[in-house]
Amino acid sequence: MKNVTKMKIFRPVNVVFEAFVDPSEIGNYWFSSSSERWEQGKTVTLRYEEYDAQGEINIIEIKDNKKVVFRWGSNEEGHLVTISLHALDNATIVEVVEEGFNDNDDNLIRNIVDNKEGWVYMLTCLKGYLESGNNTLRAALVKG
């Protein structure tokens, strides 16, 4: 099953692309830090200082200003995430497609909804940062 989330951001596609792959940008809207620039074949460590948590992603594919594909977890397990960028006039449509959900999981719907919430939140933070310079939205979501 696929989880698809899209958002329109009023910034050029190259600016949006750099926000994902440049470690100096990611802390303004998503993770606290990224261990290095996202490049095909690399394993990148992402950290959330606020939650004392970190994880690794494997960068599967990069097409400059068009697409970033990565896997959360091991190469054989976990979720495959494709972030596609589509230029539209003076804006960029960001599309996040997450695959790898277990269709037989009793918590399938809850997992999809939780992850969808996360992608919508990340894209909202990205939009606020790139369009208005607001970098205080990140890590402000309260669950529970």
Regions found by a protein language model. Give the residues of each.
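Non-transmembrane alpha-helical segments in soluble domains
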Residues: F17, V120-L123, K127
